[in-house]
Design a protein with these regions (language model features):
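Bacterial carbohydrate/catabolite-sensing allosteric modules
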Residues: 1-142
Length: 142
């Protein structure tokens, strides 16, 4: 989440704590409730970023129930790039993580830790992903 806050700062976007609502991972009902909270704010967000594509489905339902259109009234973006993200209509915009490379690197670090525990230095690894451009993200409003 530190990268999210860094991205806000680097792009001159105001940090809005009321927009940061926790929801359970991979839980459409929880995401739907969180989305309703966001939509009840006087100053609604223009885009909601969900922790995973399955949660986005719950948020999308709440947006439709509120009579709003995606992306005309509000944009939504997922994270994972699971198969459902390509089958969903309108096709969702999502961040696709490179799970295979991430898993390989994690396994290599685990093996190093097991084989040389006294020499192992914990480290943070980053793996580049990609954006799946769908139809749920509008141009930023000025």
């Amino acid at each position: 989440i530190a990268s999210f806050y860094r991205g806000l700062k680097e792009n001159g976007i105001e940090e809005r704590p009321e927009y940061m609502i926790q929801a359970k991972y991979h839980d459409p009902k929880s995401a739907g409730r969180a989305t309703k909270e966001l939509l009840e704010l006087n100053d609604k967000p223009t885009c909601i970023f969900y922790p995973d594509d399955v949660s986005l489905l719950g948020g999308y339902t709440s947006i439709q129930e509120a009579g709003l259109r995606v992306p005309e009234d509000i944009s939504i973006v997922g994270y994972d790039g699971v198969e459902i993200s390509r089958m969903f209509r309108p096709m969702m915009t999502t961040y696709i993580q490179d799970s295979k490379t991430l898993g390989t690197k994690a396994a290599q670090l685990l093996i190093e830790r097991i084989e040389e525990p006294k020499l192992f230095i914990p480290q943070q690894i980053s793996v580049q992903g990609e954006i799946q451009k769908g139809m749920t993200l509008a141009e930023a409003k000025k």
